[in-house]
């Protein structure tokens, strides 16, 4: 019985010395062409889903962001990249989590909304407004000669004839070879949810120098100037279009040129992946200390990508100060004698 095969994943390795045996994941399989993708690639494998928080379940920093600055994060693992390039952005751009209507997009609890107040003015050729996710080690692990990656997502817009573009960057890390653009496509959105697929052809890694923290960057472009049109498969500029909403749901990136069906992760698994890069530790309290020379205490947390940047916010009483930070814990110090209350929160940032 023939089985469906997915091209370009290169999971089927044929041992020509034995024509009836296929080596698959270092194990011999009989009957040659066996490659049932959903069975053999777990959701945890980057080849199956390299996007983190593709179902927009995790929002540790908040649920609504009004006029976020370029480089700031919104939903976990997503950040804004904005270059007005001499123009004026719409007076209000809001990024928010919205509740999905059951049955509209199967398996989605939430979706990502960008609400725009007006079209903005005066954008030059180099202007852009993107929503970005960076995939850690994505260039090293997913890119190369003859390799492709496929992004799939649902989208809609209440703005008539609004376009959305998708493209990528192959980044070799700090001190590595120059960044390379992976040209994609653009789509004209309707008011109904539609699924869209974009396949990016990646570049050869031969002769390239890798620095620290190589990444594959995936960009959802909401506005672009004429100088940036080619990278989303267009030849003209695209403005914000006017007042209205742009909605995005169920973002996925698969290795190869096939958009596999979206499979939501368990929330606990998705949260754990997000917390490798950022974690918000809710209110903690230390009370009734009497140590004039100071007290050092430790807070443990889920291991981070690197030792995080720590932001301490005092809720009540005396604020602790940071003594040291490690990938899975921080040491804090209280130096005032006779402390009756120290209530605080911690933000731990280890983003790329």
Specify the residue positions occupied by each region the protein language model found.
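Extracellular and organelle-lumenal recognition/adhesion modules and their flexible linkers in secreted
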Residues: 38-352
């Amino acid at each position: 019985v023939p089985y469906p095969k997915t091209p370009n994943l290169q999971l089927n390795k044929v041992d020509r010395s034995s024509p009836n045996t296929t080596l698959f994941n270092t194990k011999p399989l009989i009957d040659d062409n066996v490659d049932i993708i959903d069975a053999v690639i777990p959701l945890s494998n980057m080849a199956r889903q390299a996007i983190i928080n593709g179902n927009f379940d995790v929002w540790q920093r908040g649920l609504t962001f009004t006029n976020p600055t370029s480089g700031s994060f919104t939903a976990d693992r997503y950040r804004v990249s904005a270059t007005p390039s001499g123009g004026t952005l719409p007076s209000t751009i809001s990024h928010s989590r919205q509740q999905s209507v059951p049955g509209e997009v199967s398996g989605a609890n939430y979706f990502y909304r960008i609400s725009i107040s007006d079209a903005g003015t005066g954008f030059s050729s180099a202007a852009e407004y993107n929503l970005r996710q960076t995939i850690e080690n994505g260039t090293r692990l997913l890119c190369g000669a003859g390799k492709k990656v496929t992004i799939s997502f649902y989208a809609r817009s209440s703005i008539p004839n609004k376009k959305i573009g998708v493209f990528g960057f192959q980044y070799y890390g700090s001190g590595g070879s120059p960044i390379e653009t992976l040209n994609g496509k653009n789509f004209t959105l309707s008011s109904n949810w539609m699924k869209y697929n974009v396949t990016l052809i990646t570049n050869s890694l031969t002769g390239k120098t890798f620095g620290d923290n190589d990444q594959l960057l995936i960009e959802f472009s909401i506005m672009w100037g004429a100088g940036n049109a080619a990278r989303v498969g267009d030849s003209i500029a695209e403005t914000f279009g006017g007042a209205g909403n742009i909605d995005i749901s169920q973002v996925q990136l698969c290795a190869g040129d096939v958009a596999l069906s979206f499979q939501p992760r368990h929330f606990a698994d998705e949260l754990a992946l997000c917390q490798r890069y950022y974690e918000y530790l809710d209110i903690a309290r230390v009370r009734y200390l009497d140590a004039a020379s100071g007290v050092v205490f430790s807070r443990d947390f889920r291991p981070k990508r690197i030792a995080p940047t720590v932001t301490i916010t005092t809720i009540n009483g005396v604020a602790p100060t940071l003594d040291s930070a490690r990938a899975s814990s921080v040491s804090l110090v209280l130096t005032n004698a006779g402390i009756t209350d120290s209530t605080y929160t911690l933000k731990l940032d280890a983003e790329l």
